[in-house]
């Protein structure tokens, strides 16, 4: 009987161990790991269930950026043959991950985006109670960003750009140029200026009082009410959700009228390809020294200007030309949608000489 009891006790022990092992296995399967959280996070963002701090859905471009950054994290794990979890995200991980990205010749800003997005994931998951790791909050665990050498087109460049004989190019080139010029005159992102239609455009009647010479009393004036019509484009920016109203210049209005106030749409990649062709045909071939950062190393690369033109050049050009015209920066940000003059200044690409010309024209102090 003693023997039987021992056997039964041992069997019960084995059964209990098996039960606990199975329970632990089930618990592990149910446990939310970092990678499971990332998959769910992306799914919720795409479905619109997880929104921005402003309570708006993430734009398609932002979703694309999030997925690209987190794809690199997945590739890194494959290269290391390891699945990283919440508690693995520390300075050792940071050093290994950034070194791996540099080895792949990623630019500093691209590396910064990967780190920034991972920090967003760590913050969200911590606030939702999935971990208590705070090692990723080390001040050295950061996504570095550097200003990129981006170009803008001067007034002279734009005149050449718009004077190109389009009969020597395809109809698509002309459409791409018109869409790009809408971007210049509105200073909006391509996601906004490449989708302008009749519903975005309105005509306002503005009344103002002006003083005119009094025909019956020499040397005196009389007040007169005058009216004028202004065409305005109203946009809710896709990236930020900000509402902006852009008065249409005569140049912009001519383009809108050409398409009966319903601009055609082209894919961004197509616009980028076509406007480079037009830039080359316009003779925008001056050499621009661009500093490129790859793998943590800076290199100065001489590049013909037309090769640097892309959809975002329109927004930079528009903001810069507004600034050089003497427009107040606070009025400019009402049009561009930037949150502050500091953010706007990152877009202004005027060189030192142009800024000096602007200042000396505006202020008598320098006479």
Residue ranges and their predicted role:
Residues 94, 118, 122, 181, ...:
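Short, basic/aromatic-rich helical patch in the C-terminal catalytic core of site-specific tyrosine
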Residues 1-57, 62:
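N-terminal helical hairpins
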Residues 160-164, 204-281:
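Basic, alpha-helical nucleic-acid-contacting "clamp/cap" segments
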Residues 168-169, 261-265, 276-334:
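Short, basic (Lys/Arg/His-rich) helix/loop patches that form interaction surfaces
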Residues 123-134, 183-223:
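Short, charged phosphate-coordinating catalytic segments
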Residues 152, 222, 237-240, 329, ...:
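Catalytic-site neighborhood detector that most strongly recognizes the C-terminal catalytic loop/helix
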Residues 43-61, 70-149, 164-168, 261:
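N-terminal core-binding DNA-recognition domain of tyrosine recombinases/integrases
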């Amino acid at each position: 009987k003693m023997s039987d009891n021992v056997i039964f006790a041992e069997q019960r022990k084995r059964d209990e161990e098996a039960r606990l092992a199975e329970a632990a296995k089930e618990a592990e399967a149910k446990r939310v790991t970092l990678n499971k959280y990332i998959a769910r996070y992306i799914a919720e963002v795409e479905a619109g269930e997880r929104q921005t701090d402003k309570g708006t859905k993430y734009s398609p471009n932002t979703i694309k950026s999030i997925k690209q950054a987190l794809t690199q994290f997945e590739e890194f794990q494959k290269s290391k043959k390891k699945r990283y979890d919440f508690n693995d995200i520390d300075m050792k991980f940071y050093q290994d991950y950034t070194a791996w990205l540099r080895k792949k010749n990623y630019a500093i800003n691209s590396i910064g985006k990967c780190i920034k997005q991972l920090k967003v994931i760590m913050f969200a998951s911590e606030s939702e109670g999935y971990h208590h790791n705070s090692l990723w909050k080390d001040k050295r665990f950061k996504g570095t960003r550097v200003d990129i050498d981006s170009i803008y087109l001067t007034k002279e460049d734009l005149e050449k750009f718009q004077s190109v004989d389009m009969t020597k190019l395809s109809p698509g080139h002309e459409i791409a140029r018109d869409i790009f010029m809408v971007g210049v005159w509105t200073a909006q992102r391509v996601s906004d200026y490449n989708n302008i239609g009749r519903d975005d455009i309105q005509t306002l009647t503005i009344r103002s009082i002006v003083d005119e010479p009094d025909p019956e009393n020499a040397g005196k004036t009389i007040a007169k009410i005058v009216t004028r019509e202004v065409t305005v484009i109203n946009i809710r920016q896709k990236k930020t959700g900000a509402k902006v109203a852009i008065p249409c210049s005569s140049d912009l209005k001519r383009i809108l009228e050409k398409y009966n106030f319903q601009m055609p749409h082209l894919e961004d990649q197509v616009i980028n390809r076509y406007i480079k062709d037009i830039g080359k045909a316009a003779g925008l071939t001056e050499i621009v020294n661009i500093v490129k950062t790859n793998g943590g190393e800076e290199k100065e690369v001489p590049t013909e200007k037309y090769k640097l033109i892309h959809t975002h050049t329109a927004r930079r050009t528009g903001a810069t030309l507004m600034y050089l015209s003497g427009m107040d920066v606070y009025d400019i940000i009402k049009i561009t949608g930037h949150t502050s003059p500091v953010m706007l200044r990152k877009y202004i690409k005027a060189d030192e000489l142009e800024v000096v010309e602007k200042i000396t024209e505006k202020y008598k102090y320098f006479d």
